[in-house]
Regions:
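Conserved short alpha-helical segments that host acidic/polar catalytic motifs at enzyme active sites
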Residues: 1-214
Length: 214
């Protein structure tokens, strides 16, 4: 079981990340995002065994912020769901990247092995950005997947949260897999929320059936 979280406020994003650690803390992933077109960089990605230290993340952000002007922060915490993995590997840690797509996924892709390319990926979640690169369409890509699929996706200076099966709580521009103060639970599945004007709002939807009914 994994957890995802994010906010425009780093301290809040980290607090929401910590709320999810009860769901799994084998490894952690972090992304600081910039949405400014004139900036030389678009993101800072950090991956770690265990739990992030907030002060270390702040220092990494400070080192690059004059170049990137980061304005949103997203986390992932992981407990392996499709293996008995005990040794940490950076290549197995979210977010996964292919071309311009970055994805952090909370759940399991039950039809992972039905994709002809599956043998090229050691972690089921890592196939998602690859498929997005082929389709360039989030709703079409996720409609081909089965299982628990809630994720965050960053591409082309746009940020999305996909709700499909796994739990999701949202309050303005903040989200988490775990309930937090003033947050609303997103009950509908098969929806794609886009971060726009400091709010996460529904942008699109896709056909989704929860095979686990949870």
């Amino acid at each position: 079981m994994c957890g995802i979280a994010g906010s425009s406020d780093l301290e809040k994003a980290y607090t929401l990340y910590k709320l999810n650690l009860k769901r799994g803390s084998h490894s952690s992933g972090f992304m600081a995002l910039s949405f400014q077109e004139d900036k030389e960089c678009i993101s800072l990605v950090e991956k770690a065994k265990g739990i992030f230290n907030l002060n270390l993340l702040k220092q990494r952000i400070k080192d690059l912020d004059n170049v990137c002007n980061f304005s949103y922060f997203a986390f992932h915490s992981r407990a392996p769901t499709n293996s008995t993995e005990t040794i940490w590997k950076e290549s197995h840690t979210h977010p996964f990247n292919n071309d311009s797509y970055y994805v952090a996924h909370n759940g399991i892709i039950s039809n992972f092995k039905s994709f002809p390319e599956h043998s090229s990926f050691e972690v089921d979640s890592s196939i998602i950005p690859y498929l997005l690169t082929k389709n360039h369409n989030i709703s079409q890509t996720y409609s081909k997947l089965q299982g628990l699929l809630t994720s965050w996706v960053f591409t082309g200076k746009k940020f999305y949260v996909v709700k499909a099966g796994s739990s999701l709580w949202v309050e303005k521009d903040s989200f988490s897999s775990s309930e937090f103060e003033n947050a609303e639970r997103i009950k509908e599945d098969g929806v794609i929320l886009e971060l726009k004007d400091n709010f996460l709002t529904v942008k699109d939807s896709f056909k989704y059936t929860n095979p686990y009914f949870i």
